Amino acid sequence: MTAPQASAWAASAGEPPRVASVNTWLRQMGPPDLDAVTAIEASAYSHPWTRGNFADALAGGYVAELLLSADGLIVGYVLGLYGHAETHLLNLTVAPAVQRQGHGRALLARLRELVRLRGDRQLWLEVRQSNAPAQRLYRQAGFEDIGLRRGYYPAGVHGREDALVMRLNLSGRGHGLD
């Protein structure tokens, strides 16, 4: 990564970060982070969220957490929407260059911690049927398949892809992130 890229991805909010692991930190996402988050999103997906999508989520009070590397670079993020006794995981993304290093698991664990603190009983999400690595992460964390949303995601120029709907019941014990 070049110096300009590194500075563009650098953390910028004022809240003190929380330790996620020996080499990573967590903190809330804020408006100053949107350029870096949007860059990661565009590098990770063929149909990424826009800067406006992220800005709307922040303005709407959605839960939005960042995962930072030891040198302060944003390496991933998670966004969720709180509901009545449940939370909908909307977006969990790790920069492609640092995927498969446990960062997604750390972000998912942080969201689960926040959801439990609220007293929510369920965490649910949609995931592309073609996204086997994400499905594996969610299943290892205790999520179960509960349905299918046909044509949920855009795919290609005019196509659509089905979404697998998954749920994690938080009222019990023994799930993969305990």
State each model region's role.
Residues 15-18, 123:
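Generic short amphipathic/hydrophobic targeting helices enriched at N-termini
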Residues 115-126, 137:
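Conserved GNAT acetyl-CoA-binding A-motif
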Residues 3-9, 19-20, 24-101, 105-118, ...:
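Acetyl-CoA-dependent GNAT
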Residues 93, 129-131:
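Active-site-proximal loop/turn and secondary-structure-junction residues that shape catalytic pockets
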Residues 108, 131-134, 151-157:
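Short glycine/proline-centered loop/turn elements that form peptide/ligand docking sites
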Residues 126, 139, 144-165:
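Conserved catalytic-core motifs of GNAT/GCN5-like acyltransferases
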